[in-house]
């Protein structure tokens, strides 16, 4: 995935060349990679390496082996002796069996995703250390591809946590982080206790931009995410969502 650097102008979360030097374009400032030559620098999004050093954005990965370093996806990279996330190394990961399970990027463009080795299942959301899913069955565990939801032979997982009381056989995705089984409605990894399963309906279009409000309702309540709100406010938010969809 790593290829020779070609950018000559700043692009958010990308490396670029200026005045024969390599920089990383961060959200708030550009970072100079000291001592790095653009002639042998290879990169992919915010993973990069020179002849003797490796980088996650503008941060040098201490001890990383440049010869074997490779980007696996947006959330994970590895070399001959370690696995890296955008928050640092995964302690104890088995290099020979480590595998990514999705593309490592959520719908907001942030690094996030599931991975596993012969011993453990991992979830990384770009905020803090990677989470080890200690109850997960390694052999049967699979990501559902959106970096939020996953399952194994015993449980459904959402954002790295077991979905409470979810029935494995009847569970399905509704859309926009909502899901359900025969008796429950969920938002991400939280059960919406007040929701009526039979009448619950998602109103935010599946094609809506990721920043739109997530709106749903049933016969009894109106919801934004998993919060009950007044119908008048809900209708106003729904109009805005529809307007945002029309403007896309």
Language-model regions, residue ranges each:
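Non-catalytic tandem-repeat scaffold regions and their flanking low-complexity/translocation tails
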Residues: 2-248
């Amino acid at each position: 995935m790593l290829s020779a650097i070609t950018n000559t102008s700043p692009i958010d979360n990308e490396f670029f060349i200026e005045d024969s030097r390599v920089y990383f374009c961060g959200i708030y400032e550009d970072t100079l990679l000291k001592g790095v030559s653009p002639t042998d620098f290879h990169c992919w999004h915010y993973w990069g390496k020179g002849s003797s050093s490796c980088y996650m954005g503008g941060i040098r990965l201490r001890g990383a082996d440049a010869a074997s370093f490779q980007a696996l996806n947006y959330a994970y990279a590895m070399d001959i002796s370690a696995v890296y996330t955008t928050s640092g190394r995964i302690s104890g990961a088995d290099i020979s069996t480590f595998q990514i399970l999705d593309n490592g990027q959520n719908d907001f463009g942030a690094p996030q995703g599931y991975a596993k080795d012969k011993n453990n299942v991992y979830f990384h959301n770009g905020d803090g250390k990677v989470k080890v899913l200690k109850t997960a069955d390694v052999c049967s565990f699979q990501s559902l591809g959106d970096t939020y939801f996953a399952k194994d032979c015993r449980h459904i997982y959402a954002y790295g946590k077991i979905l409470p009381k979810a029935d494995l056989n009847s569970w399905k995705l509704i859309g926009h982080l909502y899901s359900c089984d025969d008796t429950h409605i969920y938002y991400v990894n939280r059960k919406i206790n007040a929701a009526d399963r039979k009448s619950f309906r998602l109103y935010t279009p599946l094609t809506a931009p990721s920043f739109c409000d997530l709106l749903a309702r049933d016969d009894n309540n109106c919801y934004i995410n998993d919060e009950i709100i007044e119908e008048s406010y809900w209708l106003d938010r729904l109009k805005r969502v529809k307007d945002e969809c029309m403007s896309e």
